Amino acid sequence: MPDYRSKTSTFGRNMAGARALWRATGMKDEDFKKPIIAVANSFTQFVPGHVHLKDLGQLVAREIEKAGGVAKEFDTIAVDDGIAMGHDGMLYSLPSREIIADSVEYMVNAHCADALVCISNCDKITPGMLMASLRLNIPVVFVSGGPMEAGKTKLSQHGLDLVDAMVIAADSSASDEKVEAYERSACPTCGSCSGMFTANSMNCLTEALGLSLPGNGTIVATHADRRELFLQAGRTIVDLCRRYYQEGDESVLPRAIASRAAFENAMTLDIAMGGSTNTILHLLAAAQEAEVDFDLHAIDALSRQVPQLCKVAPNTPKYHIEDVHRAGGIVAILGELARAGLLNTEVATVHSKTLGEAIEKWDVRVNRDQAVHTFFKAGPAGIPSQEAFSQSERWDSLDLDRAEGCIRDLEHAFSTEGGLAVLYGNIALDGCVVKTAGVDESILVFEGTAKIFESQDAAVKGILGDEVKPGDVVVIRYEGPKGGPGMQEMLYPTSYLKSKGLGKQCALLTDGRFSGGTSGLSIGHASPEAAAGGAIGLVEDGDKILIDIPNRSINLLVSDEELKARRLHQDHKGWKPAAPRARKVSTALKAYALLATSADKGAVRNKALLDE
C-alpha cells in the first residue's frame, strides 16, 4: 500500500520541527495518523463567481474532519475575464491559468498533502486546478461555486446575461436608460455568468470527466441544494483517500479516471451542448498533464459525428444554465448521448463505479425516483444576492420535452453535427476552431474580403468607426499566446459587430480566442499563430478568404507562389505587427510568452525549451 505522502513531514524524530509547526496550525497527536487533505479555494471579492466562496472552504474542511481526515485550506488567484475585458488586463487572463496550476502544485507538494478538493468556478480557475490535479495525480474532487441566475428586465422577453449588456451598450440607437436597465439586470447574483460560457462549460465538463458530482455544473450558486455538493465533496475525498492509501486502489486517481475515453466523453458533451471554444484549449492542456494522447485531430473527428442536443445562451436567448438543470442537468445530456451510442459508459467517476451506473441513477428519463426529480427542480429565485445557498425555490415541473425542450434526444437534435468544429487550411495549417452553435446557417459557407487589424484595440476602433463592411472577414492577428502575449478574448469585437448589424454579414478570424459569450462566424485559435510564423501573418487587406464549415476548411485564396514570396519577405522583416501597438508588456508576461505554444497545443509551456 502507498504511504501517506504527508508522512514525509509528520513521521519520525527528525520531523519534530515540522510537527511543531503543524501543531501550531491546530493539529493534535491523533491527526498525524490521518490523511492531510488540501482544500484549494479561490475566494476573491473581484469576481462574482467567487465572491461567495469565502466560507465554503471551511464548510468542506469541517466535513473532511468529520469523515476522518485533516483539512488544510489555501486560496489561489482568480481573474474575472469580463472585468479584464477590453483593456490590457485581458493579457493576464490565460497566463493566470498556468499560475493557478503552478500554485496548487506548489502548495500541495511543498506540504506533502495526500489529496485535494478543488473549489473552483470561473474561466481559468477550473482549468488551472484541473491541470494541477492531473499533474499531481493524487485523489481529487472538484466542486464549483455554481452558475449565476439569469437576469430579467421588463424591457426583455427573455433571460439576460453579461453579453446582452455589452451588445446594447454598443447600440447607438439604445437610450442611456435602456442601457442602464440592462446593466443593472444582467448579472443579478453571485455565480459564474449564466450562459454556456467558458466557466459553466468547464464545470459541466468536470462531470463528464468523472471528477465532480452530479449537478456540479448546473445548480445555481444561490440554491440551498448546492450546499450538499460541498458536504458530499468532503466525504467523498476521505473515502477516495481510504481506497487509495489503505487498499491500494489506483483506480481512484485522477489520471485513472480522466482517461483517454473520459476526455473523449468530455469533448463529446462539449460538442453536444455547444460549449465555449475555450474548452478545447483547456482540455488539450489538461490532456497533456494527464499524459493522454488527445489532440485537435481527435476533436475534429468527434465534431463530425456528435449532434447538438442542447442549445443555451449565447447560442439562443431562450435558455440559460438554470434551464439545463431543470431539464435534468449534464447527466441528462450524457444519457441521451449514451442512448445514441456516442459515449463510453464504462469509465469510472469519483462518485460511481462507472459513468453508466451514474446515468442509471441520475438521468431523469431513466430514474423516476421522486428525490432525483426534486433535485433537478432546484431553480432561481429572481432575488439579487451575493450569498451562497440563500434560497430554495423549485420549479413546479421538470423540462422532460426531448423534442422541443432545452435538451433534445438524437431524433430531435438541434443539428446533426455538434456545436464546435475544427477547420484546417493554408491559413491555419495546424487548425482553428469555431463555435458552430452560434453561426447562422446562411453563412456556414462564407467567402469574404480580408480586413486586417494588428490588435484587438485596432479592430474595436475600426468596427466602431464603420471601417468594416458587409462581406468582410475581420482578421485580428498577433494576439496569440506568444504574440499578445496572453491570447486575449475577442468578445468586444464580436459584440460590436453584432450591435452594428453585421453579425450575419461578416466573419472574424484571429489567433486569439473568444469568450464563451461569443456568437456569429467567429473563428479563433488560428495555429500556428502569427508570432510563431503562422500564415495568418501573411494575409493582406483585400485578400479573399473562403470559410467552409461543412467541409471543415478555411483557405486564403492566394497562390502558393505568392504565399511563399510573402513568407520570405516576412522572415526578413520579422514576425511582428506591421503597425506599432501602445501595449506595455510586463516582465511576467514576457516570461509567459517565451515558453508559450500555439493554441493547437493548448497554449501550454513548450517543455522542449525547458529540457534544453
Curated annotation (Swiss-Prot):
One of its GO terms (molecular function) is 2 iron, 2 sulfur cluster binding. It comes from the Bacteria. It is an enzyme of class 4 (lyase). [2Fe-2S] cluster binds at residues 122, 193. Pfam families: ILV_EDD_C, ILVD_EDD_N. Pathway: Amino-acid biosynthesis; L-isoleucine biosynthesis; L-isoleucine from 2-oxobutanoate: step 3/4; Amino-acid biosynthesis; L-valine biosynthesis; L-valine from pyruvate: step 3/4. Mg(2+) binds at residues 81, 123-124, 489. The modification N6-carboxylysine is found at residue 124. One of its GO terms (cellular component) is cytosol. Its EC number is 4.2.1.9. The keyword Iron applies. Binds 1 [2Fe-2S] cluster per subunit. This cluster acts as a Lewis acid cofactor. Coiled coil: none annotated. Its cofactor is [2Fe-2S] cluster; Mg(2+). Keywords: 2Fe-2S, Amino-acid biosynthesis, Branched-chain amino acid biosynthesis, Iron, Iron-sulfur, Lyase, Magnesium, Metal-binding. It catalyses: (2R)-2,3-dihydroxy-3-methylbutanoate = 3-methyl-2-oxobutanoate + H2O; (2R,3R)-2,3-dihydroxy-3-methylpentanoate = (S)-3-methyl-2-oxopentanoate + H2O. The active site is at 515 (proton acceptor). GO terms for biological process: isoleucine biosynthetic process; L-valine biosynthetic process. PANTHER family: D-XYLONATE DEHYDRATASE, D-XYLONATE DEHYDRATASE YAGF-RELATED. Belongs to the IlvD/Edd family. Homodimer. Functions in the biosynthesis of branched-chain amino acids. Catalyzes the dehydration of (2R,3R)-2,3-dihydroxy-3-methylpentanoate (2,3-dihydroxy-3-methylvalerate) into 2-oxo-3-methylpentanoate (2-oxo-3-methylvalerate) and of (2R)-2,3-dihydroxy-3-methylbutanoate (2,3-dihydroxyisovalerate) into 2-oxo-3-methylbutanoate (2-oxoisovalerate), the penultimate precursor to L-isoleucine and L-valine, respectively. This is Dihydroxy-acid dehydratase. It comes from Azotobacter vinelandii (strain DJ / ATCC BAA-1303).
